[in-house]
A protein has these predicted regions:
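Conserved S-adenosyl-L-methionine
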Residues: 1-77, 82-84, 89-93, 136-139, ...
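A conserved structural/catalytic subdomain of Rossmann-like adenosyl-cofactor enzymes
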Residues: 69-230
Length: 230
């Protein structure tokens, strides 16, 4: 993408009185070269440095371009939803699958929906105290078969922290609802077997006919709920 999450993270860290460039190292993979250059330019404009890999080696399904499995303090992502025709053998060889592969077509040897590849990657990148937050298709919260098996294993780790259901029209290019997932491998012991679910599908401010958002006070309300839970 264009690095928007990096920029927002940098702004947040800088606003807290720290220097994002000295406190954090930003890594990214972007298959499309143009998008990678746009990301680097966006970061440079905002005074940030990043290591962004592009091209074939940046295909996350088949490469861990930065060799970051088990090393990340934070993971943030907005991956493409419901990607199909992922080569299962290549994906398996690339690793980062602590809970196994999602469903594979026995005839084509392809993964029909890559949502749980992404979810597995984000978890696999975290170190022992790492935290992740990412956007995911709503269908991933109750998909069946191999997805359900992976989801069960993930929940049993105790590291799933918060799930937020989001309504329609929160993206310029996507009208479907989505979910926000948050992992925390350093949860308080009393929360280890708990997950906070927030149904925010009908909680939004209308921007125009095709776009909704959370206002500043709505965001603060959601943050307060999570803070009280934690």
């Amino acid at each position: 993408g264009s690095g928007g999450m990096f920029v927002q993270t940098g702004d947040f860290v800088n606003a807290g009185g720290m220097s994002a460039n000295t406190q954090m190292t930003f890594y990214g993979q972007e298959k499309v070269e143009y998008n990678a250059q746009l990301c680097l330019m966006n970061m440079a404009v905002h005074g940030l440095n990043g290591r962004i890999v592009s091209g074939d080696e940046a295909n996350s399904f088949y490469h861990d371009a930065h060799n970051l499995a088990g090393k990340c303090d934070y993971v943030m992502a907005n991956p493409p939803f419901n990607v199909d025709k992922v080569k299962s053998e290549s994906a398996s060889a690339a690793g980062r699958l602590p809970f196994g592969l999602p469903g594979v077509n026995a005839k084509t040897k392809e993964i029909g929906n890559a949502n749980y590849l992404w979810i597995s990657y984000f978890y696999a990148y975290l170190n022992d105290h790492g935290r992740a937050g990412f956007v995911m298709a709503s269908s991933a919260t109750d998909s069946a078969n191999k997805d359900r098996d992976i989801r069960e294993k993930l929940v049993l780790t105790g590291d799933v922290d918060v799930m937020v259901s989001v309504g329609n029209n929160f993206f310029y290019t996507l009208s479907l609802p989505c979910s926000l997932w948050f992992f925390d491998k350093a949860k308080r012991l009393e929360n280890k077997n708990r997950v906070l679910f927030i149904d925010a599908r009908n909680y939004y401010t209308v921007v125009d006919r095709t776009l909704n958002e959370w206002s500043e006070w709505q965001l603060k309300n959601l943050q307060a709920i999570v803070h009280l839970y934690r």
